[in-house]
Amino acid sequence: MARALLFSLVFLAILLPALAACPQNCHCHGDLQHVICDKVGLQKIPKVSETTKLLNLQRNNFPVLAANSFRTMPNLVSLHLQHCNIREVAAGAFRGLKQLIYLYLSHNDIRVLRAGAFDDLTELTYLYLDHNKVSELPRGLLSPLVNLFILQLNNNKIRELRAGAFQGAKDLRWLYLSENALSSLQPGSLDDVENLAKFHLDKNQLSSYPSAALSKLRVVEELKLSHNPLKSIPDNAFQSFGRYLETLWLDNTNLEKFSDAAFSGVTTLKHVHLDNNRLNQLPSSFPFDNLETLTLTNNPWKCTCQLRGLRRWLEAKASRPDATCSSPAKFKGQRIRDTDALRSCKSPTKRSKKAGRH
């Protein structure tokens, strides 16, 4: 009898995690592997089965995520905490979540991310922190995130990127910093994420192109700098990743000029957005060879022979942008692709291939 009772107790102990109850007012699926507690009035993190892999806690109220808030959920893969009025994430808040891949913290009131907030998240691949009030990234904050691939930090209040901000996140590929308050990227701030492929910096306050910081990047395919008061782009701006750059957004920047060698080393550019600026010329280094899309409208283009490369590109395209001349006066309002201003322009003398090799 005693042996039978002992066997029963052991059996129940083994099954207990799988038989744990679904939290009140929540919906559970797949033997409690998916727990949905969306907008159910929770004030504290509920207890769930150790077998739970997806926990959706959206639209509840957790002002502070304290240390060890999820320690009893070692098998979580996806954690949803959007719209939860979170103000602070304490050090060790996600301790124990060594299987977590997706973490959603979007649309909260997060102002403080303590160093150590992401400890133990060594498998985390997707981190969404957009639409919060984060003003700085403490050095070492991302150090545990050795597998991070996508980081969304858009729509926050970050003013500056300092050296070491992304320390440890060496595999980061997509970084979104749109709609912050960035006025500068310090030299060294991107040294730890040289493998970025997609980098969005639009709608910030960058008054000069951050050459020193960006020069550490090697494989950027898409760079978005729209809606920054840039005015000019310097020589060799994209050279360190010029063999990979395919899409460049520089619209709505009050851009007045490119330096002559701004596009030096750029060989694969396919899509460029330059509309709503103050440009009147394009540099001789502008890479038309592989270009598929070019937006040009609302710029005061000066229709002289310096635009002959643009004219040739426009003539070769079936779908062509409708940019017009602003000067000389007699050509004002004429489409660049049709104006007589460029008809007599001769092609520049090509340098020999031998002379052009490096």
Swiss-Prot record:
Complexes and interactors: Mostly monomeric. Interacts with collagen type II.
GO-annotated cellular components: extracellular region
Glycosites: 143
Subcellular location: Secreted, Extracellular space, Extracellular matrix
Family (UniProt): Belongs to the small leucine-rich proteoglycan (SLRP) family. SLRP class IV subfamily.
Biological source species: Mus musculus (Mouse)
This protein's record includes keyword Signal: yes
Bias type Basic residues, positions: 348-358
Main location (coarse class): secreted
Each LRR repeat, start to end: 51-72, 75-96, 99-120, 123-144, 147-168, 171-192, 195-216, 219-240, 244-265, 268-289
InterPro entries: Cys-rich_flank_reg_C, Leu-rich_rpt, Leu-rich_rpt_typical-subtyp, LRR_dom_sf, LRR_TM_domain-containing, LRRNT
Keywords: Disulfide bond, Extracellular matrix, Glycoprotein, Leucine-rich repeat, Repeat, Secreted, Signal
Tissue specificity comment: Cartilage.
Primary role: Promotes attachment of chondrocytes, fibroblasts, and osteoblasts. This binding is mediated (at least for chondrocytes and fibroblasts) by the integrin alpha(2)beta(1). May play an important role in the regulation of chondrocyte growth and proliferation.
UniProt domain LRRCT: residue ranges: 299-347
Residues covered by region (Disordered): 322-358
Pfam family, one: LRRNT
Name of the featured protein: Chondroadherin
Gene: Chad
Disulfide-bonded cysteines: 22-37, 303-345, 305-325
Domain LRRNT: 21-50
A biological process term (GO) from this entry: negative regulation of bone trabecula formation
